Design a protein with these regions (language model features):
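Globular "head" domains of long coiled-coil molecular machines
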Residues: 79-223
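Phosphate/adenylate-binding "loop-and-lid" substructures adjacent to NTP/NAD/dNTP-binding pockets
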Residues: 68-77, 84-85
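Extended alpha-helical coiled-coil stalk/rod domains used as structural arms in giant protein assemblies
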Residues: 1-55, 59-66, 196, 202-293
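Short linear sequence elements within intrinsically disordered, low-complexity coil regions
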Residues: 68-71, 102, 276
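A general boundary/transition motif marking the beginning of the first structured unit of a protein
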Residues: 41-44, 57-61, 75, 89, ...
Length: 293
């Protein structure tokens, strides 16, 4: 009789253990499912991000957005001497300034920097021969530029900066960017720009962060502008996405590791549950044997 009671206690204990393992299994399955869902979402996000980066990179590589002449010259760099590339590809700026700088440069974005006047002459002959259109060339040996000299302008309300100081470039291009942007002020908004223009008697050009322009002499140009249409906006987006991509890929690897760990925990819980069920069956069989069934 004592053996039967012991067997019944063993069967009951095994049933209790199974209940605990079943709860643990449910918890670990929820955790594993959540980890899998997080990994799938991150995989999709990373895929979309990588596709966007690939598209923008291809557009940069193919000089998408540049005119025919610029494309022809840049794609023939191996056959032409002294070609550095279009202004837009020789500089970087923060995303918050990209629209203003793009407007400030205008067609100058597509000007092609070359070593010498002779290199510009050869490139012009190349375009003429191929009926490839026209381009403007900026020889490093010829271009000279100056920065704004008006005193106190940097202290004006709404002054963001002289445009040439809001872009990053190799120091050898300093004269190029001074000539293109050295006498342009970037202002917070049109009200600030108008106040500055009045005070300094329209002595320099002002471009606002949202792309409105007050020209030297007082004429104004403005309206709506697409923030994603230009080559600088594209370059700024590409730089931002590349920075984000490394972080996203790191998170994806962490999500994969978390999913794998949760699956291992789930497998361990399944093994424990299976073992407990085997022990319960053995205990129940022993009870039946002792009962003489």
């Amino acid at each position: 009789r004592r053996a039967l009671e012991d067997a019944q206690e063993d069967a009951e204990a095994a049933a209790n253990i199974i209940s605990g393992h079943t709860l643990r299994m449910e918890e670990r399955k929820k955790k594993a499912d959540a980890a899998a869902e997080a990994r799938v979402k991150l995989t999709m996000d990373v895929g979309a991000l990588d596709n966007r980066i690939r598209l923008l990179t291809e557009m940069e590589k193919d000089y998408e957005g540049f005119n025919k002449a610029v494309k022809l010259v840049c794609q023939a760099q191996n056959n032409l001497r002294g070609i550095h590339g279009p202004v837009a590809s020789l500089m970087k700026t923060d995303g918050k300034y990209s629209l203003a700088i793009e407007i400030a440069l205008g067609a100058g974005l597509q000007n092609i920097v070359v070593d010498r006047e002779e290199d510009a002459k050869s490139a012009i002959a190349f375009l003429k021969q191929r009926e490839g259109g026209r381009a403007t060339f900026l020889p490093l040996t010829a271009i000279r530029g100056e920065e704004l000299r008006e005193r106190g302008v940097e202290n004006e309300f709404g002054f963001v900066g002289v445009a040439s100081r809001l872009v990053r470039f190799d120091p050898k291009y300093t004269q190029i960017f001074n000539s293109l942007l050295g006498k342009t002020v970037i202002a917070e908004d049109l009200d600030c720009g108008i106040a500055m223009a009045r005070k300094y008697r329209n002595a320099f050009r002002i471009v606002t962060l949202d792309g409105q322009v007050i020209n030297r002499g007082g004429s104004m140009t403005g309206g709506s502008t697409s923030r994603s249409a230009g080559v600088l906006s594209r370059a700024a987006e590409l730089e931002r996405l590349n920075g984000r991509a490394s972080e996203m890929h790191r998170k994806l690897e962490e999500a994969r590791a978390a999913e794998e760990a949760s699956r291992r925990e789930l497998d361990a819980a399944q093994y424990e549950l299976t073992t407990a069920e085997t022990q319960r069956r053995a205990a129940e069989d022993e009870v039946l044997r002792l009962q003489g069934v």
